[in-house]
């Protein structure tokens, strides 16, 4: 009797070890230890959650963790940035446009006081040159007054999202490191969560979703923004016709994102299935987030335009 109980007791650690293979960490640092502990916590969470028996628990937990972390850590900053962008486009730009006649008038007075001489074309060129300098300074003042400077608006979402994205990718990659229980779970075209998708379906989906996010950014653009872009394009063409070199940051940014869409396919093809699933889920969430925020912004612009017309008519 005692020997039987002893034998059963000795089997329990081996059964636990079979359920959770022990992985050797060559060199423990604070980062590697934290990543390892988080990956173990993820595996425990997947088993603890009450998923239906027919659902793959680890894959569903990856999707759930992705959605929850995006909702908690990225959506608030994206809304914050969208509000700042809205103030810049609907408060700063109209006010600056309203002040441009007075800026031109002040520049002409300054030129008369300075005794500027030249033909008509030279005078117009000088007025435009000085007006651009004054308008740029005034724009910076208005952006600061309305708390919508472009640099924090662009940088804050990147600063908050990038560490989360990299850290979560490292956690899921660590969870897929052999030996792991993820070997036995398949999902979609993944024969195993610990191996890359041999069909390249998920990496290609990732590239398509990323490209769709880039190209769909113009779907909800207002008529004022389109008109302003056309004016900028015309102004750029005129400057290039005169032999000037003009850089367009927005087009450079769009081109870089398109290249990134292709690059993500190549990178995603080399990472484990857990990371591929996380990246595709995160990109899909980001696409719907962009659509939702852009639609919300479009509706807000429409309401703002209606209220402005009502004020003018009153």
Describe each model-derived feature in a short phrase:
Residues 60-69, 131, 135, 150-174, ...:
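Hydrophobic alpha-helical transmembrane segments of multi-pass integral membrane proteins
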Residues 73-161, 226-261:
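Membrane-interface amphipathic helices and adjacent TM-edge segments
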Residues 13-14, 29, 33-37, 58, ...:
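Transmembrane alpha-helical insertion/packing segments
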Residues 1-39, 314:
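N-terminal mitochondrial targeting presequence
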Residues 178-313:
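Hydrophobic alpha-helical transmembrane segments and adjacent short intramembrane/lumenal linkers
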Residues 81-82, 169, 173, 177, ...:
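Membrane-water interface at transmembrane helix exits
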Residues 29-61, 182-197:
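Interfacial loop/helix-cap signal at membrane boundaries in integral membrane proteins
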């Amino acid at each position: 009797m005692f020997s039987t109980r002893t034998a059963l007791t000795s089997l329990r650690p081996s059964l636990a070890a079979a359920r959770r293979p022990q992985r050797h960490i060559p060199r423990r640092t604070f980062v590697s230890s934290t990543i390892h502990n988080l990956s173990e916590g993820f595996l425990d969470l997947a088993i603890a959650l009450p998923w239906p028996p027919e659902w793959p628990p680890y894959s569903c937990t990856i999707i759930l963790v992705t959605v929850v972390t995006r909702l908690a850590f990225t959506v608030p900053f994206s809304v914050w940035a969208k509000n700042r962008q809205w103030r810049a486009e609907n408060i700063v730009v109209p006010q600056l446009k309203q002040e441009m006649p007075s800026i031109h008038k002040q520049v002409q007075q300054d030129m008369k006081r300075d005794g500027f001489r030249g033909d008509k074309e030279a005078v117009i060129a000088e007025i435009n040159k000085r007006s651009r300098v004054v308008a740029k300074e005034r724009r910076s003042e208005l952006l600061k007054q309305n708390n919508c400077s472009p640099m924090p608006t662009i940088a804050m979402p990147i600063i908050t999202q990038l560490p989360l994205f990299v850290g979560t990718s490292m956690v899921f990659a660590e969870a897929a490191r052999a030996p792991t229980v993820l070997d036995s779970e398949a999902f979609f075209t993944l024969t195993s969560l610990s191996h890359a998708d041999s069909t390249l379906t998920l990496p290609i989906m990732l590239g398509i979703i990323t490209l769709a996010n880039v190209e769909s950014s113009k779907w909800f653009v207002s008529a004022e923004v389109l008109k302003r872009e056309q004016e900028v394009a015309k102004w750029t063409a005129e400057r290039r016709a005169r032999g000037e070199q003009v850089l367009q940051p927005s087009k450079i940014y769009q081109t870089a994102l398109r290249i990134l869409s292709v690059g993500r396919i190549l990178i995603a093809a080399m990472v484990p299935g857990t990371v591929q699933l996380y990246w595709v889920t995160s990109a899909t969430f980001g696409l719907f987030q962009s659509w939702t925020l852009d639609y919300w912004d479009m509706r807000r612009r429409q309401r703002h335009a209606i209220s402005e017309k009502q004020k003018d008519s009153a």
